[in-house]
Every structure is written in C-alpha cells, then in structure tokens.
A protein has these predicted regions:
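Viral structural modules
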Residues: 1-407
C-alpha cells in the first residue's frame, strides 16, 4: 500500500498597482505678474495604511511657480492634497506629480497636476508537492522559490550646509533626487546606501538676473530594522523624500551665502529568502498503480535591483530666440511613455522637457518650453519589472539656432 508524503512550496507573486488622480489649488501672487516663467510640483507621501485588501495613500503636493515682475524674478508656493486606494496590501508606495500646468481662473491663477500613485507588494502562493512516501520510487527535483519578510518602513534625516562665493538674493527653486546605490540584508535589518542629490537654482544680487545652479551629493547609509532578515538573504527596498527644508543665510558685505538643506527620507524594504525544496518530478511503484497530477506553478525569483546611469545629448523641438542667451532652466521633468520587453531586452521610451529662460537682445526675458524624446535599452536575463526613470541633471545650450539638451 502506498502512503504518499507531501510538502508545501511557498512562493511570492509580485503584484503592482497604479492610480492617477487630479488635484489643484489657487496661486495667490502678492504683486503684479508680468509673465509666468515656470511652474512645477512635487508630491510627498504623508501616510500609507492598510484598509482591508487595499492600501490608502495620502500625499501633499507642493506647487512652485516662478514669475516675472518689474523687479525681476520672484517665486511663490502653494499646497494641495491628494489620495488614492491602491488595490494591494502592505505596499511599497511612491507618488509623483505629473502633467503640471498653470491656468487663468477668473481674476487669478490655478495650478493643476496629476498625482500618480504606484505600489508593489507580494502575495504568497502555496502549492502542494509530492516529496516521497512508502512504496514509492521517485525522481527528485529541486524547487526554488522566494519567501519575503514583513515590509518595514522608517524615516531618517539627511542634512548638508555649503557656502557659495556670491550673495544669494533668492532661491528660485530646488529639487532633490534620491539615488539608492545598494540595498543589502543584514541581521534583522536592511542596509540602504546612496546619495541625496540636491540641486539649487539661486538668483544672485546682480543686474543680469543670471540663474546659478548649485549641485551637491550628500551620501547616506541607513539601517532599517526588518524582522526576520539575515545576511544570506537579498533585500528589496526604496527610499523616498518625505519633507524638505532649504534655508539661505546671506552676508552681502562679504558677498557670500550659506545654504543649508535638511531632508526627511523614508526607507521601506524587506528581506527576500531563497528557499530550496525537494520534490518529485516523477514517481512509480513496483506494486501499485500510480496516477500523478502534474502542475508547473509560475514561480518568480527575485535576482536583485539594478541601477544604471545614462548620459544623453539630443536636439529639442524648440529654437532659440535670435540674439538671446540662456539664463538657466526651470521645470525640468521626465515622462515615461512605454516599457516594452522582448527577447531579453527592455526598451524604455519617454521624453524630457524643461523651461529654458533667455535674456533677449533687447534685455527682455523669454521663456521657451523645449522637449526631446529618448529611448533606452536594458539587457537583463529574465523578467524586468518596476522600471523607474529619474532625471538627475539637465543642461541646455544653443547649437545651430536650436536648443539642445544634455541630461
């Protein structure tokens, strides 16, 4: 008589979700506006909580506008809120402001954008497998699957202060890019290493209104407590920006300024354990008839996260005004249109755009919106998922009368 023995193979199925919502708020300028130069927006996640089989994500959106008055460039800021319910639980979530625009409303202005909420989580699938038994002769095989720990999240702070050799009249805008270089698993922790790349667009005390760009990279290392994580595991995680504070202290007598930046970041991650289970790929008996039900479960194996930098120089769709020179760029943004995978190659198509500010030959100011497409190829074995593209830096120049981007 056959007495079969069974085991269970647990595997993690990655699930992803994306929801885009709209938000807007009025922009109140304190003085007469000659021209709107640029508007952009940043979305900060304020909370993420499980609600049944969903994750409720809330975000604050900061709209930032640069405009021109009789006294030169000025800036203003306004805030809105957005929320969405992602149809997944325990998600690693992100929020991004897209399609930012300004429009006239009655006697004023309103800023609008879409907020794209994305998240990914893991759902455990269980499959029963034959492992042996009395009266059975089996052909063994090894089933490899992943098990993930619980997802953890915690905030930490990154700060920097630097001096510039000119007197700053005003910081027109600033942006922060969180570059994660590695996520490793340790004893009950996930270890994140990377840089917080800070870009400040400053307006000095001068008559030419040049916009000066300052860039700083602040390294960070953060150990996130993760229950069940061990050094022989892989780790999966993200770091996002939660809060930002930029302050300027100017000494006009010395013609110097000090710029301080404090960022609150949130690390979210988990450990990924590779489990090997012995199972039977075939079985028979010398004494009894054996009937097998064969099943090939779809098991995804996490091989790690890849990070890659790409430098592109491309002509845009815009021309430079005759006799004008570039003062700077504002409102830089990247948009991904499609991600397609085939035969081990993943192609990412998108575009980069920016507001290019010119000083005209008659000493006036012109803002030209320029955009250029891009295409990137990634070659990796296996399935590529959760592709993200960030714009780290952009320089505009005039070549042959056209605006060219290097990014």
């Amino acid at each position: 008589m056959i007495q079969a023995e069974y085991g269970v193979v647990r595997s993690e199925k990655r699930t992803a979700a994306e929801i885009k919502v709209a938000t807007e708020c009025p922009i109140n300028f304190n003085e007469e506006v000659k021209k709107i130069i640029s508007v952009n927006a940043v979305a900060f996640i304020t909370s993420a909580e499980n609600k049944g089989e969903k994750t409720l994500v809330r975000a604050k959106v900061a709209f930032r506008a640069v405009y021109l008055t009789e006294d030169g460039f000025k800036k203003c800021e306004a805030f809105a809120e957005a929320e969405a319910e992602l149809p997944i639980v325990g998600a690693i979530v992100c929020a991004e402001a897209v399609d930012v625009r300004m429009s006239s409303v009655n006697d004023g202005f309103a800023a609008r954008c879409g907020v794209r909420f994305t998240g990914e989580s893991f759902k455990t699938d269980e499959n029963q497998v034959l492992t042996g038994g009395e009266g059975l002769i089996i052909k063994p095989c090894e089933v490899i699957a992943d098990e993930v720990t619980e997802t953890a999240s915690e905030e930490f702070t990154v700060a920097d202060e630097f001096e510039v050799n000119y007197a700053v009249k005003e910081v027109l805008c600033h942006s922060e890019f969180i570059r994660v270089k590695s996520v490793e698993s340790g004893v009950s922790r996930a270890i994140f290493e990377g840089d917080a790349e800070i870009t400040v667009k400053a307006l000095p005390f001068s008559e030419n209104n040049d916009i000066i760009k300052e860039k700083r990279a602040v390294p960070f290392r953060f150990e996130l407590p993760v229950i069940g994580a061990l050094p022989d595991m892989l780790a999966l995680g993200e770091v996002r920006l939660c809060k930002e504070a930029v302050k300027v202290f100017t000494d006009e007598a010395k013609n110097k300024s000090s710029i301080s930046v404090e960022l609150t970041l949130a690390a979210t991650g988990c450990g990924v354990n590779r489990i090997k289970t012995q199972a039977a790929i075939d079985a028979y008996s010398r004494t009894d008839e054996v009937m097998l039900t064969r099943n090939q479960p779809a098991i995804e194996i996490f091989e790690g996260t890849r990070y890659r930098d790409e430098r592109i120089t491309a002509k845009t769709n815009a021309a430079a005004p005759d006799g004008a020179r570039i003062l700077g760029t504002l409102g830089e943004a990247v948009t991904v249109f499609s991600v397609n995978s085939s035969d081990g190659k993943t192609t990412i198509n998108g575009s980069v755009k920016a507001d290019v500010i010119f000083r005209n030959a008659d000493n006036g100011t012109t803002c030209v919106q320029a955009e250029t497409p891009f295409s990137l190829d990634i070659t990796e074995e296996g399935k590529v998922c959760n592709v993200k593209v960030a714009l780290c830096d952009l320089t505009a120049r005039v070549r042959g009368g056209d605006i060219e981007f290097e990014f």
